[in-house]
Swiss-Prot record:
Family per similarity comment: Belongs to the Mediator complex subunit 25 family.
Organism: Bos taurus
Keywords assigned: Activator, Methylation, Nucleus, Transcription, Transcription regulation
Function field: Component of the Mediator complex, a coactivator involved in the regulated transcription of nearly all RNA polymerase II-dependent genes. Mediator functions as a bridge to convey information from gene-specific regulatory proteins to the basal RNA polymerase II transcription machinery. Mediator is recruited to promoters by direct interactions with regulatory proteins and serves as a scaffold for the assembly of a functional preinitiation complex with RNA polymerase II and the general transcription factors. Required for RARA/RXRA-mediated transcription.
Region (Interaction with the Mediator complex): 1-226
Annotated InterPro entries: Med25_PTOV, Med25_PTOV_sf, Mediator_Med25_SD1, Mediator_Med25_VWA, vWFA_dom_sf
Biased composition (Acidic residues): 737-746
Protein name, per record: Mediator of RNA polymerase II transcription subunit 25
Annotated positions of the Asymmetric dimethylarginine modification: R724
GO CC annotation: mediator complex; transcription regulator complex
Source lineage: Eukaryota, Metazoa, Chordata, Craniata, Vertebrata
Length: 746
């Protein structure tokens, strides 16, 4: 445990990135349920700030992100060594992922591919860092759960960390400030060595003995960056108190092992009355044999995903107080067939990837909520009937609390020439509450004004979201265009902040409108701490603008430092129009070849710079997708192959006021009527910002004929191998597109 890093409970404003790296082999399967109950679920509850609940809509915009990596052994071929689940902000959904792991294979192996799992986890943390640019540093924790030492093999499946050994990977984890923890049912010296090597360089903490937090003397629990309950009996959600661990070798015949399932739900209790001298693996083997007999007898289903279905059964309470996952209890034949509405975790535990298409069942809005996590895009116009129908059905058992009009402003979908043009939309809406709740809406105004906020800015307000009452918004589809626009905006990374005017004598000052992509409904959160929530929004917006200012300054500095020796003055001249453009014109997706002098000069379009779809993250205009700003052009691989280009490099023309950048004057070097050439495959998207005003070779010669293969010069190393300089950053989108909204809020 890191001394002084955490208190006994979770800090209120903790924003964490959590990755569980789990061995998905049969070597861990018999012990996983005990580890899950005593260590994994308390850890999830620590980061979540409370027990995971399916109705926690604040998790969609809350701070903590969870991700799951499952690795195997070398005998899993031809399957991939690692299965990675897309990040989710819902702790409830993350628990369903844990319940859906199939522990198979690895019986003939004494080691596991820990290096593959850790290399994938490091790539996840790299992605988290890009996602978290708006809020800065987060609390990052990597938890390894395994029951075997690592192979002495480097990682091969990871693109970024290929060739790194397990020890190298844990050292990288420690150097990057990621807290590394290990949970294992056995005390393995190789795993303890990994834990020691993952210590941050500046942290020389004494290791606490594992017995302080372990629930079983055989377990090895080494944790950093989180707090687990000490001793037995404090694990959340057990149906009965934890049985005492039989420390002497000869235990009474009725004693049970702590890793064996102890719940009285299954109707075969005789398999739990085992002698105390049997190991946990033997107990699990007996359970598996008994379950196999029951399956052959037709008493239970023949597939293992019965566990996610049992986890999703309503009315049981917390998701971790149900049937143990290490055995399949033979229930009645109709048991694994609950109605579809009670199966929210079925799809998400099978393949939670971002590439899954939304379900095409317009008549089943309850199943539409089972879209795999990561699919956060708004519904297509053809599917708008399903959410509207689902909203009507879901409010039938609620009370109408308020009826009026919701108004908001958005930018027109076809980008207008005038950046200040806004489209005002309004929709009739109703607010519903549950039976027994009293929401005083008599003083609410007839029209509510909503302002859009990028949901990335709300990640630090997760505790305030949880400490709020929940109402449901229902919109009538009289204005279909406005309804489509609302679904499109709210489903693509925005939340609505509804301000109540000070003239209205109501106790509510701010209300957050959130769209749940899983439930397909609009939820309104009314924080109990109104003043704290308003101050929190102001604070995150202020921090956001400071971060953006720092990034712009860093990019200007980086662009000047990374220029090749002869390009300093050229880069400075090119930076000026880019900066002016950043202040004057927001990025607009434009078709190829329609930007003034670029089209006139035959300026080519960079590969991969097609106009971005609406809602796609766009960087600053100097690096935005679409035609580059006038001035920089793509640079050929070897400037020395063309003497005219070489002389242009050495003697750049001085910039003149009121004259377009030099590519128009250099147009005579290209044959008239020549079509624009595409850049070579090695050309990166970020290179137009660094290259001087250069030309492409005439189309009569191909790239290989014009530029024969030769060794790269030292100066060219800076311009190859991917984007350099001011490249588009996903986190820079709100700085240009939503500045007016943020200023209104401040």
């Amino acid at each position: 445990m890191v001394p002084g890093s955490e208190g006994p409970a979770r800090a209120g404003g903790l924003v964490a990135d959590v990755v569980f790296v789990i061995e998905g082999t049969a070597n861990l399967g018999p012990y996983f349920e005990g580890l899950r109950k005593h260590y994994l679920l308390p850890a999830i509850e620590y980061f979540n700030g409370g027990p995971p609940a399916e109705t926690d809509f604040g998790g969609d915009y809350g701070g903590t992100q969870y991700s799951l990596v499952v690795f195997n052994t070398v005998d899993c071929a031809p399957e991939s060594y690692v299965q990675c689940h897309a990040p989710t902000s819902s702790a409830y959904e993350f628990v369903t992922w844990l319940d859906g792991i199939k522990f198979m294979g690895g019986g003939g192996e004494s080691c596991s591919l820990i290096a593959e799992g850790l290399s994938t986890a490091l790539q996840l943390f790299d992605d988290f860092k890009k996602m978290r640019e708006q809020i800065g540093q987060t609390h990052r924790v990597c938890l390894l759960i395994c029951n075997s030492p690592p192979y002495l093999l480097p990682a091969v499946e990871s693109t970024t960390y290929s060739g790194c050994t397990t020890e190298t990977l844990v050292q990288k984890i420690g150097e990057r400030g990621i807290y590394f923890s290990i949970v294992s049912p056995r005390k393995l010296p190789a795993l303890r060595l990994l834990f020691e090597k993952a210590a941050p360089p500046a942290m020389l903490e004494p290791l606490q003995p594992p017995a302080d937090v372990s629930q079983d003397p055989r377990h090895m629990v080494l944790v950093r960056g989180l707090v687990l309950p000490v001793g037995g009996g404090s694990a959340p959600g057990p149906l009965q108190p934890k049985q005492p661990v039989p420390l002497p070798p000869a235990a009474p015949a009725g004693a049970t092992l702590s890793t064996a399932p102890q719940q009285p739900l299954p109707p075969v209790p005789q398999q739990y009355q085992v002698p105390g001298n049997l190991s946990a693996a033997q107990v699990a083997a007996q359970n598996a044999v008994e379950a196999a007999k029951n399956q052959k007898a037709g008493l239970g289903p023949r597939f293992s995903p019965i566990n996610p279905l049992q986890q999703a059964t309503p009315g049981v309470g917390p998701p971790y107080s149900q049937t143990q996952a290490t055995q399949l209890p033979p229930g009645p034949p109709g048991a694994p067939k609950p109605p579809p509405a009670s199966q929210p975790s079925l799809v998400s535990t099978v393949a939670p990837g971002p590439g899954l298409a939304p379900p095409a069942q317009p008549g089943a809005p309850s199943m539409a909520g089972t879209v795999a996590p990561g699919g956060v895009s708004g519904p297509s116009p053809a599917q708008l009937g399903a959410p509207a129908l689902g909203g009507q059905q879901s409010v039938s058992n609620k009370l109408l609390a308020w009826s009026g009009v919701l108004e908001w402003q958005e930018k027109p979908k076809p980008a207008s020439v005038d950046a200040n043009t806004k489209l005002t939309r309004s929709l009739p809406c109703q607010v519903y509450v549950n039976h027994g709740e009293n929401l005083k809406t008599e003083q609410w105004p007839q029209k509510l004004i909503m302002q859009l906020i990028p949901q990335q800015l709300l990640t630090t307000l997760g505790p305030l979201f949880r400490n709020s009452r929940m109402v449901q918004f229902h919109f009538t589809n009289k204005d279909l265009d406005s309804l489509k626009g609302l679904y499109r905006i709210m489903g693509n990374g925005f939340a609505g902040c509804v301000h109540f005017p000070h003239t209205a004598p109501c106790e509510v000052r701010v209300l957050m409108l959130l769209y749940s992509s899983k439930k397909k409904i609009f939820m309104g959160l009314i924080p109990y701490d109104q003043s704290g929530f308003v101050n929190g929004i102001r604070q995150v917006i202020t921090n956001h603008k400071q971060v953006q200012q720092q990034k712009l300054e860093q990019q200007r500095g980086m662009g000047a430092q990374q220029a090749p020796p002869g390009l300093g003055p050229i880069l400075e001249d090119q930076a000026r129009p880019s900066q002016n453009l950043l202040q004057l014109r927001p990025p607009q997706p434009q078709p190829q070849g329609t930007v003034g002098a670029s089209a006139a000069a035959g300026q080519p379009q960079p590969q991969g710079a097609a106009p971005a779809p609406p809602g796609a993250p766009q960087g600053p205009p100097g690096a935005a997708p679409g035609p580059p700003p006038p001035g920089p052009l793509l640079r050929p691989q070897n400037p020395g192959a063309n003497p005219q280009l070489r002389s242009l490099l050495l003697n750049p023309p001085p910039p003149q006021t009121g004259v377009p950048p030099p590519q128009a004057s250099l147009h005579h070097l290209q044959p008239p009527g020549a079509p624009a050439l595409l850049p070579p495959p090695h050309q990166g998207l970020g290179q137009p910002q660094l290259g001087p005003p250069l030309l492409h070779p005439p189309p009569a010669q191909s790239w290989p004929a014009q530029l024969p293969p030769r060794a790269s010069l030292p100066g060219q190393m800076l311009l190859s191998g991917g984007p350099r300089g001011p490249v588009p950053q996903p986190g820079l989108q709100p700085s240009v597109m939503e500045d007016d909204i943020l200023m209104d809020l401040i």
